[in-house]
Regions:
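Polar, enzyme-active/binding microenvironments
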Residues: 60-63, 75-260
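N-terminal beta-propeller domains
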Residues: 1-99
Length: 260
């Protein structure tokens, strides 16, 4: 049986000027091209056809955007779309949306303390003033908890809701349950400074959101509201001009963002 000596070609030489095509005496130019359309050369040499693309959807407000992948596992992926001061997450190529419900949090903007129950232990202080909730545990073993009841109409009880919570100065401990102090609807979680959107399905006529702090310094909550219907977005500090300078890295289920 005769031996075959197949030729091995390297297609990663890339594109060169037409004036250089005649320089076949230069090893690197022998397999270069003046035009390379719909081909993807790789560093190690092979080249393949560029995969097809298709229109999925417009960016938020048709604005310039940068997409950052989120990959937690093979079946847990998302896309973080950054546009002008807005972050819009997408799952399975569709934005996360909030349903239309009639539920609301009375005095969720803390314009008044009516309806809010403030409990302090160990010389701590919890105040609602100037449109803010401020909690401060000045003494060791101090604790502040602030909660209220939120009514859910019968037609909305099986519909997914979301609390939109703005923290001016964190961290703040938050939970929500079917009874005061419980967390059977939203498990106890720590909210850092920023805007948060926490989804939940009430399955009850009344739910009880609660804020808590054990810290010996001021923590400040700006507001808690029920998300309006439509695509869920979050504010960011990055304007359109900042988008090319965004850098990111992911660790488990956390994406760290920076901007040069």
């Amino acid at each position: 049986v005769g031996k075959g000596l197949p030729a091995l070609y390297s297609f990663n030489r890339g594109i060169v000027s037409k004036q250089a095509l005649g320089r076949v005496d230069v090893e690197k130019l022998k397999l270069s091209a003046a035009e390379m359309t719909n081909w993807q050369p790789t560093i190690l040499g092979p080249m393949s056809l560029r995969p097809g693309t298709r229109y999925i959807r417009s960016t938020y407000s048709d604005a310039e955007a940068v997409n950052i992948p989120f990959i937690r596992a093979l079946d847990t992926t998302a896309l973080l779309e950054f546009s002008n001061a807005i972050l819009r997450p997408l799952i399975s190529e569709a934005p996360i949306t909030r349903a239309s419900v009639s539920t609301s949090v009375t005095n969720g903007d803390f314009s008044s303390g009516t309806g809010w129950n403030v409990t302090v232990v160990g010389g701590a202080a919890g105040t609602i003033s100037g449109g803010k909730l401020t909690m401060d545990c000045a003494n060791l073993n101090g604790q502040v908890t602030v909660d209220r009841s939120v009514s859910v109409s019968g037609g909305d009880q099986a519909t997914e809701h979301a609390f939109r919570i703005v923290i001016d100065r964190g961290p703040v401990t938050f939970r929500c349950g079917t009874t005061a102090g419980d967390d059977d609807i939203i498990s106890q979680t720590t909210l850092l400074t920023g805007t948060h959107s926490l989804a939940f399905t009430p399955n009850a006529a009344t739910v009880y959101p609660q804020f808590e702090s054990l810290l010996s310094r001021d923590v400040i909550v700006d507001s808690i509201t029920v998300e309006a219907s439509g695509a869920m977005t979050l504010p960011t500090p990055y304007a359109t001009a900042d988008l090319p300078n965004i850098r990111w890295t992911q660790s488990a289920d956390v994406v760290f963002i920076a901007c040069d």
